[in-house]
Amino acid sequence: MDSTVAAASVIAAALAVGLGAIGPGIGQGNASGQAVSGIARQPEAEGKIRGTLLLTLAFMESLTIYGLVIALVLLFANPFA
């Protein structure tokens, strides 16, 4: 593998994981805060809010996992090498 391609792959993998985790991390924090606020205002809706929150958090976490998969492909199964 060319050293330039290897260096670019490592940098791209780092960016995929780093930038892929920023958005979902902020979104998960905001969603959790809003869920706590909603439960505090309306305790009888706790079950519905919690279920919706867990589903939403799973969808947000999948974006981070996609970034990790792209990084692993770039590092170990690089199509450009």
Curated annotation (Swiss-Prot):
It comes from the Bacteria. Its main location: membrane. InterPro entries: ATP_synth_csu_bac/chlpt, ATP_synth_F0_csu, ATP_synth_F0_csu_DDCD_BS, ATP_synth_F0_csu_sf, ATPase_proteolipid_c-like_dom, F/V-ATP_Csub_sf. It is found in: Cellular thylakoid membrane. One of its GO terms (cellular component) is plasma membrane-derived thylakoid membrane. GO terms for biological process: proton motive force-driven ATP synthesis. The record marks E61 as: Reversibly protonated during proton transport. It is a multi-pass membrane protein. Keywords: ATP synthesis, CF(0), Hydrogen ion transport, Ion transport, Lipid-binding, Membrane, Thylakoid, Transmembrane, Transmembrane helix, Transport. The chain crosses the membrane at residues 6-26, 57-77. It holds the Pfam family ATP-synt_C. One of its GO terms (molecular function) is lipid binding. The keyword DNA repair does not apply. CDD domains: ATP-synt_Fo_c_ATPH. Belongs to the ATPase C chain family. F-type ATPases have 2 components, F(1) - the catalytic core - and F(0) - the membrane proton channel. F(1) has five subunits: alpha(3), beta(3), gamma(1), delta(1), epsilon(1). F(0) has four main subunits: a(1), b(1), b'(1) and c(10-14). The alpha and beta chains form an alternating ring which encloses part of the gamma chain. F(1) is attached to F(0) by a central stalk formed by the gamma and epsilon chains, while a peripheral stalk is formed by the delta, b and b' chains. F(1)F(0) ATP synthase produces ATP from ADP in the presence of a proton or sodium gradient. F-type ATPases consist of two structural domains, F(1) containing the extramembraneous catalytic core and F(0) containing the membrane proton channel, linked together by a central stalk and a peripheral stalk. During catalysis, ATP synthesis in the catalytic domain of F(1) is coupled via a rotary mechanism of the central stalk subunits to proton translocation. Key component of the F(0) channel; it plays a direct role in translocation across the membrane. A homomeric c-ring of between 10-14 subunits forms the central stalk rotor element with the F(1) delta and epsilon subunits. PANTHER family: ATP SYNTHASE LIPID-BINDING PROTEIN, MITOCHONDRIAL, ATPASE PROTEIN 9. This is ATP synthase subunit c.
